Amino acid sequence: MHPGPQPNGLQAAEDGLWAIDQGNNHLYKLDWQDGSVLEDLPTETDRSSGVTIGGGNIWIASTYTAELFKCNMDGTTVERYDTPGKGGVAFANTPNPRTTGAHGMEWIDDENMWVAVPPAQKVFLMDPSTMTVKRSIPTPGIRPHGLFMHEGAMWLADTAACKVHKLDPADGTVLAEVDVPAPEVHGMTLHGGNMWFCCAEPRRVCTVPLPE
């Protein structure tokens, strides 16, 4: 059971699993073995849905402010940036949904960071040193969420479709797909050859082997 009310983004690290909570906007580091809380960091984000680590910083997708936060390793804010592709989502239950921003994030290196943005149905490749967009690829579903890179391919969760898609990051071509019928897939990361994903409503963090 996740310690917060609604886990929504994950990022693997050698010393623990980072999880951002959409309910209380706290960032937790969890022990890989028993899920115990190693760190509990409050943040200034709102309805956070994604997290990644890189360049000595924590990066968080603040979904309801449609911003990307650059934070210190203690969770305090360094800078906040506008989210590319922000807007209303296609899966909303209202005719005029509020403007929201990014979900999944994945740091690659000092010049490359992927950001999944459901309103745009795209994953943007950004330069974290300038926070400018380099290019983007389309998503196969309407609700892209967590993502990670492995052996040159992108693995992208889609919460609405209950699937994880393996994509060519050059153009978004679907190379394979994995059904995740229950309970739901939100944030996602890779550790020890396994996919780890979080389920917001049941407050679960789950893991399955990465398909061949």
Predicted regions and their residues:
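Conserved beta-strand positions in repeat-built beta-propeller and related beta-rich domains
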Residues: A19-N24, I60-T65, V115-A120, L156-A161, ...
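Ankyrin-repeat and related helical/solenoid repeat scaffolds used for protein-protein interactions
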Residues: F148-W196
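Beta-rich, blade/repeat-based domains predominating
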Residues: H2-E14, E44-G55, G85-D110, P140-E151, ...
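Short loop/turn segments that connect beta-strands within beta-propeller blades
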Residues: D31-G35, N72-T76, D127-M131, D168-G172, ...
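A short beta-strand motif characteristic of beta-propeller blades
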Residues: M1, S36-L41, T77-Y81, K86-P95, ...
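Beta-propeller domains
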Residues: Q22-W32
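Short coil/turn linkers that define WD40 beta-propeller blade boundaries
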Residues: N25, G35, A66, G75-T76, ...
